[in-house]
Amino acid sequence: MSPISPPASGVGLGYGIAIAVSILVLISFIMLASYICIRSKSTGRDEATSDVVLDLPSPAAEVKLGLDRPVIESYPRIVLGDSRRLPRPNNGPCSICLCDYEAREPVRCIPECNHCFHTDCVDEWLRTSATCPLCRNSPAPSRLATPLSDLVPLAFQIR
């Protein structure tokens, strides 16, 4: 008797072709779905952008965080002499623009903390923020709550 050999059928080849066709169909479906999603998002962005523009609050509802010009102008303004020394011993550069102070340059000091800065720098800063750029304390007449001013009393209570 001779050994029995398996039938010579194309069953193994049929599975390979079926798997390859299935993978190609799946890849095609994923690419089509991605194209549709990207296409719908790009057209949806234009509509969403126009909705946002239409739903903006009115300028009357704008909140101003900085100080008014008369308050800023009330802070002492000095012109540096040839020695270029500031009234308080913070002889480093301006903390806002990081430039050195020059002779005969106008400097404005914040009365609450005595920190000094270039007049143009600190005026612009105080128009947008009501705190000292260096120590973050509020120079405003109506004491605004600042992170540092809240922590200082706590530090004295611990001791």
Curated annotation (Swiss-Prot):
Gene3D superfamilies: Zinc/RING finger domain, C3HC4 (zinc finger) (3.30.40.10). It is a single-pass membrane protein. Pfam families: zf-RING_2. The chain crosses the membrane at residues 13-33. It comes from the Eukaryota. InterPro entries: ATL67-70, Znf_RING, Znf_RING/FYVE/PHD. It is found in: Membrane. It catalyses: S-ubiquitinyl-[E2 ubiquitin-conjugating enzyme]-L-cysteine + [acceptor protein]-L-lysine = [E2 ubiquitin-conjugating enzyme]-L-cysteine + N(6)-ubiquitinyl-[acceptor protein]-L-lysine. GO terms for cellular component: membrane. It is an enzyme of class 2 (transferase). GO terms for biological process: protein ubiquitination. Its EC number is 2.3.2.27. Its main location: membrane. Pathway: Protein modification; protein ubiquitination. A zinc finger (RING-type) spans 94-136. Belongs to the RING-type zinc finger family. ATL subfamily. PANTHER family: RING-H2 FINGER PROTEIN ATL67 (PTHR46592), RING-TYPE DOMAIN-CONTAINING PROTEIN (PTHR46592:SF14). The RING-type zinc finger domain mediates binding to an E2 ubiquitin-conjugating enzyme. This is Putative RING-H2 finger protein ATL69. It comes from Arabidopsis thaliana (Mouse-ear cress). The lineage of its organism: Eukaryota, Viridiplantae, Streptophyta, Embryophyta, Tracheophyta.
